[in-house]
A protein has these predicted regions:
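Structural core segment of the AMP-binding/adenylate-forming
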Residues: 56, 79, 83-146
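Conserved AMP-binding/adenylate-forming core of the ANL superfamily
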Residues: 26-71, 75, 79, 95-98, ...
Length: 223
């Protein structure tokens, strides 16, 4: 009989919820457009986004394509998906989106309005209700701001298999995935994020630095 991989705590929960539980939620996490976000703010965004994804009918293991610039929405999409047991994949809008979607096979996508025009043809492969747009020009899609606002700010984090995918980066030709065990080790200083190769994901380095700052409960540069 095959040995079942050990289960581990959810990485997003250990990153953020641990700070809240230890009364460090009022610490400054990052700033965006002159607004300061505390770790309590990050926790609420993460949980509301995870609940939004559940509301779209996504299940554990579902992939969520993120086409977003450095912003609170990208943090929320990434951590919310991970905490909900899903797999966020950081896309790069200029990198062959049709091929990306064919390989990633996302169940949903969160897209910034500034990428929507160039991405819309590729996103037609997804159900229209599965595309959520950040910004005011949603073009008939769900509005991220409106949808998140109506979600509960609490979300249970299931334990996950250590070898289950937690986070992915589109490299231009393939998806580079990290397991929960690998991501947990990374945020505490061991190893590197994937996303290299001939067409590295431009977000990988900045996201890695931000996650490590989160693990220390420090001010982070938004990614």
């Amino acid at each position: 009989m095959a040995e079942v991989a050990d289960h581990v705590p959810n990485v997003a929960s250990t990153l953020i919820d641990t700070l809240i539980a230890s009364n460090r939620g009022d610490r400054h996490a990052f700033s965006y457009n002159d607004k300061r976000y505390s770790y309590q703010d990050v926790a609420a965004l993460m949980n509301r986004t995870g609940n939004l994804l559940h509301g779209l009918g996504l299940e554990a293991g579902s992939r969520v394509l993120l086409l977003l610039p450095a912003s609170p929405a990208r943090v929320a999409g990434m951590l919310g998906a991970i905490k909900a047991g899903m797999v966020p994949v950081l896309g790069a809008p200029a990198q062959a989106l049709e091929h990306c979607i064919a390989i990633v096979k996302p169940a949903a996508a969160i897209v910034h309005q500034k990428y929507l025009q160039e991405a819309e043809a590729a996103l037609a492969a997804l159900p229209r209700d599965a595309v959520v747009v950040v910004g005011s020009d949603v073009r008939g899609h769900k509005s991220f701001v409106d949808e998140v606002r109506g979600q509960p700010s609490w979300l249970a984090a299931p334990d996950v298999r250590a070898d289950a995918p937690a986070l992915g980066f589109w490299t231009g030709a393939a998806v580079a995935l990290m397991s929960h065990a690998e991501l947990a080790a990374f945020v505490h200083g061991t190893g590197d994020l994937p996303g290299g190769g001939d067409a590295p994901n431009p977000a990988a380095a900045a996201i890695g630095a931000m996650l490590r700052a989160f693990a220390r409960g420090e001010d982070a540069t938004l990614a």
